[in-house]
């Protein structure tokens, strides 16, 4: 079975794809070809540079997202908004982000030239011809890779030898056609571009909607062309249930790489657990998402010791504002020197009396083990609502460990609270205020 991995774009949020790759690697899936467009170029660059999925996750954790932005010469900004070449350039990506992520264009070319190597292709648009080129990994270089992520308005294009190279997103954001041209019998599409019915107001959201329409439209055109040619293949798609936070939230620290990675792992495991050998129908439903119910997202971190060494638990919890609007979502990881970082699969939140529990599975010591982290909440809502939330019991593989939320963890939790699925200022503020006032008692009240 010849498999192609098709990595769609998604900006800096493609940190999510590192979590997906961790799950696929654990399953032993191998690919003979990797294709990438836009932000997916980062994931392909890491894979084709020889990084394991574990290394990819570690490197994303250490990236400073501010390095994605680098300023133009000061004189360019004096031209005024109507003559500004772009908000910034790709120097930060080339000089800081690529090295931090372990992306080495020389290594990519060298590895691609080896006998039996995984094939690679990077989609970049040449503007003078308005044409998308799937540049082979044997011919790619760092400047072209960065150009493939240089969105108009935000980053300047690459000008080279009379040609202008830029992000392919306005033509396509995933190249299934290239995968089929290279003989794929099975295509794994890793998709983190929003695709819900929600239409937002304002220039940023509508700029993103244009990307969504271009990306989804080109994908459907690939499906239709394959069907017209009688080209059969199996399609698997890993995508979030709800659209991921946008890049500005990542850049401003309202979501971080570790959270996106854990979400990617959660979403990949959800698909792997439910997939069939026949894959998915090749239509608009394969990448469709739903809007989350109004609520909040927060980061819950606790620490303890096992065998005299530090144990860290970290969860990202998405909690709807009203019971019946949906179930809470849970993703995250457990970290210990003996086994490293293991991610949560099938995460859920359960309430039993005054006990609030996070439950999930983790792949540990070659097998799946059930994990439960439980708080018993006695205090009434009010100023002391957080005091009894600082202690929890972790159960894993028959072992029980006491974990504690330090003052720094509690402060970080409160600082991490972000509204989700809420689009007006009043609705967003209300969701955050209610949770921060009542703490984890709010979960008991609702669920």
Please describe what each predicted stretch is.
Residues 1-37, 45-293, 423:
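Patatin-like phospholipase
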Residues 289-447:
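Beta-strand-enriched cores of mature, soluble protein domains
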């Amino acid at each position: 079975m010849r498999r192609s991995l098709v990595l769609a774009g998604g900006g800096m949020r493609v940190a999510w794809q590192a979590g997906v790759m961790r799950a696929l690697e654990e399953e032993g899936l191998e690919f003979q070809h990797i294709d990438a467009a836009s932000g997916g170029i980062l994931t392909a660059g890491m894979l084709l540079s020889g990084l394991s999925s574990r290394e990819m996750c570690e490197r994303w954790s250490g990236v400073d997202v501010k390095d994605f932005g680098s300023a133009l010469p000061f004189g360019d900004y004096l031209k005024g908004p109507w003559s500004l070449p772009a908000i910034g350039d790709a120097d930060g990506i080339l000089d800081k982000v690529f090295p931090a992520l372990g992306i080495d264009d020389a290594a990519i070319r060298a590895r691609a030239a080896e006998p039996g190597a995984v094939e690679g292709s990077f989609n970049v648009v040449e503007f003078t011809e308005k044409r998308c080129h799937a540049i082979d990994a044997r011919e790619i270089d760092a400047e072209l890779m960065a150009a493939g992520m240089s969105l108009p308005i935000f980053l300047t294009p690459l000008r080279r030898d009379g040609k202008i190279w830029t992000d392919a997103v306005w033509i396509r954001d995933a190249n299934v056609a290239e995968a089929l041209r290279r003989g794929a019998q099975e295509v794994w599409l890793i998709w983190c571009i929003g695709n819900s019915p929600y239409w937002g107001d304002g220039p940023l959201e509508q700029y993103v909607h244009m990307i969504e329409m271009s990306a989804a439209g080109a994908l459907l055109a690939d499906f239709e062309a394959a069907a017209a040619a009688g080209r059969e293949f199996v399609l698997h798609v890993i995508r979030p249930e709800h659209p991921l936070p946008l890049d500005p939230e990542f850049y401003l620290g309202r979501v971080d790489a570790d959270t996106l990675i854990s979400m990617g792992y959660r979403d990949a495991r959800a698909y792997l657990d439910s997939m069939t050998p026949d894959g998915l129908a090749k239509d608009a439903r394969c990448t469709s998402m739903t809007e989350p119910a109004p609520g909040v997202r927060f980061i819950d971190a606790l620490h303890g010791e096992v065998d005299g060494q530090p144990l860290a638990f970290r969860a990202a919890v998405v909690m709807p504002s009203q019971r019946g609007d949906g179930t809470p979502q849970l993703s995250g990881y457990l970290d210990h020197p003996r086994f490293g970082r293991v991610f949560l699969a099938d995460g859920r939140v359960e309430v039993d009396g005054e006990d609030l529990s996070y439950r999930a599975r983790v792949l540990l010591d070659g097998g799946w083990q059930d994990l439960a982290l439980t708080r018993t909440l006695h205090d009434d809502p009010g100023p002391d609502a957080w005091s009894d939330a600082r202690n929890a019991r972790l159960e894993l593989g028959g072992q029980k460990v006491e974990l504690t939320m330090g003052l720094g963890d509690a402060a970080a939790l409160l600082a991490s609270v972000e509204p989700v699925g809420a689009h007006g200022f009043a609705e967003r503020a209300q969701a955050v205020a209610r949770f921060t006032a009542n703490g984890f008692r709010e979960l008991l009240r609702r669920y």
